[in-house]
Regions:
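Structural/interface elements that position substrates and couple domains in central-metabolism enzymes
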Residues: 2-449
Length: 449
């Protein structure tokens, strides 16, 4: 198969399969780069929301919300969200980006959604197509899972008849548009031609720095390592925080002192655990090939367990404090349910895990507040407060699970909010949202984790 460079540069259609937290902003990035874009997703109700700009994402570009960008995109006539594969893939010179994730089922990577997407794509794949997988994969999946599946479904060779590559996405939710084009982006195909072709394609999307790697396995492994590195470092910070709390030390002060050392200034912040789709699952994308090769991962596995246990540790610390204060039935308020600060995403949220544990083990009132997270996504029967003030009112303990406005960046200046608590009272601040000294001056005990 030959792809003429002039022909390549005039290809103007792109199909993005999977319009989630990666695929949706990526599809809009392709549109802004001049492509006509087809966005394919199996969720019919979600596609209708996309067409209306009704999505639960906190992304902005140039001061405009993703919701406004979506409405304008659909009205342009060059952006086509659809559930119909024949519509999304019915053109020659196909350029396809796969952003279908691999969730965990019973602690193991489950590629069933990816497999289904590949069946849909493979049955419609045309000679000369370019396929770039961008969702994080189990190491070895580009060559060992995606390629054979597409070959079996299409009857074509992934080295001769179409090009297949893997390129890791490194965007963080809330910064998607900037980081999709601004972050250095590695890519590698099954062949040198696939590598160079996919690199040119990514550059046409507006990505400023594309690195051509030696093989897909190198890019897959690097991506998983990136996520694991953060998971491990957060686990270390969480253990530091747990130690400081047990010894009555100011966690924030101690960590700031540590960071004055120039060789450890990168120390992560502790928190309620690690949430979202990416970091908690990374170990499970590395484990299958590691086990097959007989390579142990004790540090990685222990760190994952530390972060898994952190929500339970925080919940138990709160319950122990209430018991010692004679407030076993006291109201507990959880402020912020998102998986990280200023997010709409509650997948794998440690704050939700805290709420789930307290719902099962706390005999008193439990209230939660989060203006950004869709309650349907939490999948937990809770007493949702309409305002921050009503959540805090009468509470014996507050757990800060995630900062959301008006829990603004840095310290909350108006600690008069705490005057509504039922004292003696406690704040378990997993996000350093409150100033410790100001809280103590209000007669409220303070723990930073």
């Amino acid at each position: 198969m030959r792809v003429d460079i002039v022909e390549l540069l005039t290809m103007d259609k792109v199909t993005v399969i999977g319009l989630g937290y990666v695929g949706l902003p990526l599809s809009l990035t392709a549109l802004s780069a001049g492509f006509e874009v087809f966005g394919l997703d199996v969720r019919a109700d979600y596609i209708e929301k996309v067409k209306r700009g009704d999505v639960q994402m906190a992304e902005t570009q140039g001061g405009r919300s993703i919701q406004d960008i979506l409405v304008e995109a659909v009205e342009s006539g060059r952006y086509h969200p659809t559930t119909k594969p024949d519509e999304a893939l019915g053109y020659d010179n196909q350029q396809i980006i796969l952003t279908v994730g691999i969730p965990l089922r019973d602690g193991k990577a489950d590629p069933s959604m990816l497999n289904s997407a590949l069946e849909t794509l493979g049955a419609r794949l045309r000679k000369g197509a370019l396929v770039v997988a961008r969702s994080t994969l189990v190491v070895g999946y580009t060559r060992g899972f995606i390629a054979p599946k597409l070959q079996n479904m299409s009857g074509m060779s992934p080295t001769d008849d179409f090009d297949l590559a893997f390129s890791s996405e490194r965007m963080a939710e809330g910064s998607a548009f900037d980081e999709l084009v601004g972050m250095v982006t590695p890519v590698a195909g099954l062949t040198p031609r696939a590598t160079s072709r996919s690199a040119r394609f990514l550059e046409r999307l507006g990505i400023k720095s594309v690195i051509q790697a030696s093989c897909p396995e190198a890019v897959e492994t690097a991506k998983v390592f990136e996520n694991i590195a953060r998971d491990v470092n957060i686990a270390l910070a969480n253990e530091y925080a747990n130690f400081c709390t047990a010894f009555g030390l100011d966690t924030k002060e101690v960590l700031e002192l540590v960071r004055t050392h120039k060789r450890v200034g990168f120390l992560h912040h502790p928190g309620p655990g690690v949430g979202g789709h990416c970091l908690p699952q990374a170990m499970h994308y590395l484990k299958p090939p590691a086990e097959e090769a007989g390579v142990g991962l004790p540090v990685i596995e222990t760190s994952r367990q530390v972060n898994c246990n952190q929500p339970i540790h925080i919940a138990r610390l709160t319950l122990d404090w209430l018991k010692d204060a004679g407030r076993q039935k006291g109201k507990v308020a959880i402020l912020g349910l998102a998986m990280k600060d200023y997010s709409t995403d509650a997948r794998w949220s440690p704050a939700v895990d805290i709420a789930r544990y307290l719902k099962a083990h706390h005999g008193g009132e439990l209230a939660v507040w989060d203006d950004n997270v869709d309650r349907e996504h939490v999948n937990l029967d809770l007493d949702y407060a309409d305002t921050l003030e009503s959540a805090v009112a009468g509470a014996s303990a507050i757990i800060v699970g995630a900062r959301q406005s008006p829990l603004v960046t840095g310290s909350v200046n108006d600690v008069s909010l705490l005057d509504g608590m039922d004292k003696p009272a406690l704040i378990v601040d997993t996000r350093f949202a409150f100033d410790r000294k100001s809280v103590l001056e209000r007669g409220v005990d303070y723990r930073a984790l």
